[in-house]
Amino acid sequence: MTWVSLFYVSSQDFEGDIKSLKTVFSQFEKQIHQKDGYRFSPEAEFAMGWYFYTIYVKIGFIKKLVEYNHIRDPKVKDEKAILKIVQNYLKIQKSKSRIKFDRDKPTLRGYYHWLLR
């Protein structure tokens, strides 16, 4: 499977935020029974007190995750809902980090049409 850059993270507490992100992505792996579905960029950039790094996922991993969450909540149609889950988890952990899509448009933008057939 191909790795794609999905999320871009800006963090002031590198160690704490990496731990929180690993926790939430490990839970995602347990939900869909898949291993090695995500990885972090090998090197983080540091500037002005912030660390910047990318989270890469396998296309199959994110598709299964969207399908799983769509079954639980039909409003989930693409990875935007996954981004919200991650952002909410970081808020609960009182993290100041920012997470967003690594590009302008989500990877699975039109994928939900297949789910609704």
Predicted regions and their residues:
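A structural detector for beta-sheet-dominated domains
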Residues: F7-S10, Y56-K58, D102
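Short, flexible N-terminal segments of the mature chain
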Residues: I18-S41
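Amphipathic alpha-helical binding modules
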Residues: K80-R117
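A common structural junction motif
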Residues: E29-H33, I71-A81, L90-K96
